[in-house]
Amino acid sequence: MESSSECSSISDFQDSTEGDDANTLPENLCMREYVVICDYVATDNTQLSLCSGDKVLLLNAVSQDWWWVNHNGTCGYVPASHLHDALNEQEDTEVNDPWQDEEYYGSYKTLKLHLEMLSDVPRTMTYQNVILKNSSSLCGKHILDLGCGTGIISFFCAKFAQPEAVYAVEASKIAEQTCRLVEQNGISSLVHVIRQQAEELDLPTKVDVLVSEWMGTCLLFEFMLESVLQARDRWLKEDGVMWPSTACIHLVPCSAYKEYSNKVLFWDNPYQLDFSLLKPPATKEFFAKPQPDYILQPEDCLSEPCTLFHLNLKTLQVAELERMNCDFTFLVHTNGLLHGFTAWFSVQFENLEEQGHLELNTGPFSPLTHWKHTLFMLDEPLQVQKRDKISGSVVFERNSVWRRHMSVTLSWVISRELKMQKVGCKVFPIWR
């Protein structure tokens, strides 16, 4: 889906509204249908309040930022950034492999991704610590390690605990190497490698613990979590343990001057030449989708982060993954440029032998992981001041066709001393 750009201040277009009647439908205009991509609440009687999914007819693109539209016979102004051209919706609904299993499992059959994951010390050591701190409780238990890869978590279980059995399930071809590693390390009596997809899994018994490292970009991308939840429902005992036990998605408004400078401002004067006409296409090319390998520095955070979603993996249902939405409010703590928002996730592991939990946090205030951070760039930076309020909403929506993909819709309002300064909305596909 093509993403929209953010809007400028309301005051920029007020002069053009004088004399217009918000309830009069202009005649003899070529009208085109647009879809509202996120809710908008009118701030005066020249504007329309709209909900996500509403359809409107464009009557007049008054400015780049504010359009005059008709909705169910009523006319008014709405931010252009909240609208998407209905004619550009070209999603292919007839695909042979909506899960892209061949591509997905193919990416895990070589060592490249496994080297990246095993080299991620915070990630891998967190799982090791979970096993170590709960080793007594794992004695004599049946453990399911779903999506085991090279089997590192299963190896930890065999080495540090005394389980009855570990079922190391892996659907990709790397399972052949995992079998050899189990033999080589002399743990084949404990660890049973099963090359199957989770949905086809057939175990000899239900398990006491289901452990998996299923997290992707923005926590959910690839949606391996669906397979984990299905395995939970089929194979985890009623009083069984899920590791991770809970998961959270976090967000913060941020400055990203270097990113914006390197990819947009660069075109102003390369080699003393004016290439500035390339700035709009550069913005669209580089910022239409999120930056998944961004490293956010703590000093670039413009406020304290917030937790958008808190998922209980013992009770979460697959249907809840289709669409998740949340409102947010940030209080800006320093003057600066708002270039966008950065997201990351954390997962928590229930302790069985003492109170509290262990946590793997992938955010900018914790040791860097291979997930890094996900940057959602605005099309243009916005000036903010200390004590400004940034409020809005975020919607995570799963792609109805390409089931491993999703979109993130961010809408925001910047307010200063109770007066709205800027309003905008942008849709980011990850990745279709």
UniProtKB/Swiss-Prot annotation:
Residue positions annotated to bind S-adenosyl-L-methionine are: 114, 123, 147, 170, 199
Keywords, ordered alphabetically: Cytoplasm, Methyltransferase, Nucleus, S-adenosyl-L-methionine, SH3 domain, Transferase
Q: Name one GO biological process term.
A: negative regulation of G1/S transition of mitotic cell cycle
* One Pfam assignment: Methyltransf_25
Q: Where is the composition biased (Low complexity)?
A: 1-11
Main location group: cytoplasm
| Domain named SAM-dependent MTase PRMT-type: residues | 101-405
Instruction: Report one GO cellular component.
Output: nucleus
Q: What is its EC number?
A: 2.1.1.319
Catalyzed reactions: L-arginyl-[protein] + 2 S-adenosyl-L-methionine = N(omega),N(omega)-dimethyl-L-arginyl-[protein] + 2 S-adenosyl-L-homocysteine + 2 H(+)
**TM stretches of this protein:** none
Gene3D superfamilies per UniProt: Hnrnp arginine n-methyltransferase1 (2.70.160.11), SH3 Domains (2.30.30.40), Vaccinia Virus protein VP39 (3.40.50.150)
Where in or outside the cell it occurs: the entry states: Cytoplasm; Nucleus
Sequence segments annotated as region (Disordered): 1-22
Active site per UniProt? 213, 222
Quaternary form? Interacts with ctnnb1.
Family membership: Belongs to the class I-like SAM-binding methyltransferase superfamily. Protein arginine N-methyltransferase family.
What is the stated purpose of this protein?
Arginine methyltransferase that methylates the guanidino nitrogens of arginyl residues in proteins such as histones. Involved in growth regulation. Involved in embryonic dorsal development.
The protein's name is Protein arginine N-methyltransferase 2
Task: Tell me what organism the protein belongs to.
Answer: Xenopus laevis
Query: What taxonomic ancestry is recorded?
Result: Eukaryota, Metazoa, Chordata, Craniata, Vertebrata
Name of the gene this protein is made from: prmt2
